[in-house]
Every structure is written in structure tokens, then in C-alpha cells.
Swiss-Prot record:
Record-given protein name: Pyridoxal 5'-phosphate synthase subunit PdxT
Record function comment: Catalyzes the hydrolysis of glutamine to glutamate and ammonia as part of the biosynthesis of pyridoxal 5'-phosphate. The resulting ammonia molecule is channeled to the active site of PdxS.
Residues binding L-glutamine: G46, E47, S48, R106, I132, R133
UniProt keyword annotations, A-Z: Glutamine amidotransferase, Hydrolase, Lyase, Pyridoxal phosphate
EC number per UniProt: 4.3.3.6, 3.5.1.2
Pfam families assigned to the protein according to its UniProt record, in alphabetical order: SNO
Amino acid sequence: MTVGVLSLQGSFYEHLSILSRLNTDHIQVKTSEDLSRVTRLIIPGGESTAMLALTQKSGLFDLVRDRIMSGMPVYGTCAGMIMLSTFVEDFPNQKTLSCLDIAVRRNAFGRQINSFESEVSFLNSKITVPFIRAPKITQIGEGVDVLSRLESGDIVAVRQGNVMATAFHPELTGGAAVHEYFLHLGLE
């Protein structure tokens, strides 16, 4: 197994660091050749509009979507979740990978100054995770499993087959529970 981390923009170094700690083979994905070498992909948090532009400019956008639709496990955090979604409510014309049957609203928990940490349940354990200009999942389609919610009831982590996403940034906490779950995605 080789995990790729899309490394065009955003918090990719933090994901690479966690994968190193987990002794998992991993590479940065910046080109189509890089993408061809991976069996799993992480799309990091960052700025979704910039990430979209960079994936299109690099020629990776369609290749990433094709690999995901062919069954490659993928995990998106924050902006990565926006990129995986099928619809962005506040930017209805924003192009997405459309690989995860959810609708999202960008920056729904507030601006940068409104960033916060919260304890959430994830797979029967509690983890404290940061929400930084985080998107909110406003709708989920059939076949989408909820992995985590805030106390308010807001859905903050989901999975649909080989695709998972979180509104929060577990890569910034040093904890590895979410990444460990992703590494087993599709192996169960």
C-alpha cells in the first residue's frame, strides 16, 4: 500500500508527518506519474478554490476523479471534503470531483477568527479536533454513513464506500485515529 497526499496546496505536510509516524509508505502527489504510483489518496485541507484551480492546471483533476470512481480509497479533510462533494450550496457553480453524495456550505462555522476545537466521537472513541473555516455538511445522500457529529447534531465526518471526508483537521492534532481508519478503508 502506498498512500499519496495531494501536495499542491494546504496542510499536506501534516498528513505526510502522520503517515510517517504510522510507518506507512507514502508520497507527495504533484503529477500524474505520482498519482499512478499510489493505492490511496488524501486530499488535504486548504483553500478549495485554489486547490481546484491547481488540480485543473496540473491535469490531475480528471485523473483523480477517475481513480476514485474506479475504487481507489480517498480521504478529504475540510477543503478536501468540499472537493469530493457533489454540491456546494453557497457556490453552486463550483466544480467538484462529485465522488461523495453530500452537499456542503463553505466556511459554515465562521471565518478564521471563529476557528475552534471540539471533542467529537469517532468510532466509539473521543478525539479533540480543530475546525478551521470548516465546511458544514448540509445534506447526505443514500449510502452515506455518518462517522461523527458535533454535540449540536452537525455531521462532521462521513463515508460512502471508498470515499471518506471530515470537516475537521485531524492532521493538526498529532492523533492518528482517523488516519488509521482510512488506512483500513476497503480492507474490512
